[in-house]
A protein has these predicted regions:
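Positively charged n-region of N-terminal signal peptides that target proteins for export
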Residues: 1-5
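Extracytoplasmic/secretory soluble proteins
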Residues: 9, 17, 23-492
């Protein structure tokens, strides 16, 4: 009898666990190459995770994988894949070809219908492999460029100069900033121009000739071409050389260090860079601490000397590049698959979208009941880590207006500028080609031309070197074939 009672008690205890087990959330692992600054050390402090769990019943866990692509290769071999997989550049095709990704086409019209409606007219081509959709598309809501030509307006006023709009005007204003004591301290201690670390300054110059200093695949007049082959490239290099060969014109450290520090210090009056480094509140505070009268304004792009659209900077505006995809194993686990769809569809609700952009309403942000506009609270900085959750990207202009209202004049300028749109993210190089080696060689030679270490008369020889040594001509042939296959109305 005692044995029977014991068995009944065990059975009752087991039954008591069934509802709890049934209520256990479905766990989805989202693999990440990096996590946002200030990422919570424990899930209990990750309010986005907690809110998604509360609203969907899904444990949506973002995890950092060190040495990401090498580790993913090992996971593929070991059949130990996360549910949502980060990729970049050609890895989307690599993973799809290795059959580790789920084709999304069967789910577009039903399970992912809310997502597709939210994405609007976003181009799906960059997220396809062999005509099938594998990558989760990112919202395309216009130009997301951050670059502009930033100029000391108070220096222009001191010297009675206008904001430059052409390459020649930019050069002349920069010369005046060197020679005419724009800060009024009686000392010749200023440079003409600086930029973001590397080539941003020289990209702005070259964009005045409808080109940029690197391997950028372009479409011009219905044909696939490359920035290196643009008719204005030699003119662009001549102007870059003119800038570098003028004494005190170019910040000597521009290739290795961003010009933000010398711009804030008052040592230069023109800065070609992305807007956050000079227009976010912390930067404005630093500028004011050095010189309360300093006033930086955004400008550009320069007039296109080749007759086309004025463009500021080379931008991958066609999509692709990096993103997330779903593991093929989800096709065999309906519960997990539906859990993923549930979270993705929550992402594109008003509540979900606001959560992953701004944080929790009432804690990190509030909405003005009259205007409907969102503003961040004093605790808004606690939501700075959440950008990694933005799998579908974000509504950029609205986001920037909420997060950085102090910089609206700068990001409005950069986002309304024309850009040099390139298509590299869609192209897979031919077998046997080492693209990274070619691009490294291109960069060294561009710098040699810019700084007078290689004569411009050798530019045609440089292109021949790319063809002979790096399969550049075959690469361009492949680019044309692939863009045609994607459905672009272009010819070789």
């Amino acid at each position: 009898m005692k044995k029977l009672v014991s068995l009944l008690l065990v059975a009752m205890m087991a039954l008591s666990f069934i509802p709890a087990m049934a209520d256990e959330p479905v766990e989805i692992i989202v693999a990440c190459k990096s996590l946002g600054n200030g990422w919570p050390a424990v899930l209990e402090d990750d309010f986005v995770y907690q809110k998604i769990l509360e609203e969907t019943g899904v444990a949506w866990k973002l995890i950092l994988i060190d040495d990401y692509f090498a580790a993913m290769g090992q996971r593929i071999v070991g059949d130990d894949l996360p549910d949502v997989i980060y990729y970049s550049d050609s890895y989307l095709k690599t993973y799809a070809d290795e059959e580790v990704l789920l084709c999304l086409d069967p789910y577009v019209e039903k399970e992912l219908a809310p997502v597709m409606a939210w994405l609007g007219d976003t181009n799906l081509i960059p997220y396809q492999v062999n005509g099938e959709l594998y990558g989760l598309p990112k919202l395309h809501d216009g130009n997301k460029s951050q670059y502009n030509i930033q100029i000391r307006k108070d220096w222009l006023d001191n010297l009675n100069l206008a904001v430059p709009t052409t390459i020649e005007e930019l050069y002349n204003v920069a010369c005046k900033f060197i020679t005419d004591d724009p800060d009024g301290n009686g000392v010749a201690d200023t440079y003409g121009i600086t930029g973001g670390k590397g080539l941003p300054l020289f990209h702005a110059i070259s964009c005045a000739f409808d080109t940029a200093l690197g391997n950028y695949i372009l479409i011009r007049d219905g044909k696939v071409t490359n920035a290196l082959l643009q008719p204005g490239m030699k003119n662009a290099l001549e102007w870059c050389l003119k800038f570098t060969q003028t004494e005190n014109m170019v910040d000597p450290d521009v290739l290795t260090t961003t010009g933000n520090n010398i711009a804030i210090a008052g040592s230069v009056g023109i800065h070609v860079n992305s807007w956050p480094g000079m227009f976010k509140q912390y930067a404005q505070d630093n500028i004011a601490a050095v010189n309360p009268n300093a006033k930086w304004i955004p400008a550009g792009p320069l007039h296109n000397e080749m007759g086309g659209e004025d463009v500021m900077y080379p931008i991958n505006n066609v999509g692709g590049g990096d993103g997330w995809a779903l593991c093929a194993d989800l096709a065999d686990d309906e519960e997990k698959l539906q859990a993923v769809f549930k979270v993705l569809n929550y992402y594109v609700t008003e509540e979900g979208s606001n959560l992953i952009q701004y944080g929790l309403e009432g804690d990190h942000w509030v909405r003005n009941p009259e205007t409907g506009r969102i503003t961040m609270t004093e605790n808004g900085a606690a939501a700075n880590y959440i950008s990694t959750y933005q799998i579908f990207s974000r509504i950029e202009l609205e986001y920037l207006q909420v997060k950085f209202p102090e910089a609206e004049v700068a990001f409005t300028n950069s986002m309304t500028n024309g850009v040099l749109e390139y298509y590299n993210s869609l192209i897979v190089e031919p077998d046997g080609m080492y693209l990274a080696d070619m691009e490294s060689y291109i960069k060294t030679q561009m710098l040699a031309f810019i700084y007078g270490e290689r004569p411009l008369e050798e530019y045609d020889a440089f292109i021949k070197e790319l063809n002979d040594l790096y399969m550049f001509d075959e690469y361009m042939e492949a680019a044309a074939d692939q863009l045609i296959a994607y459905g672009y109305d272009v010819t070789k």
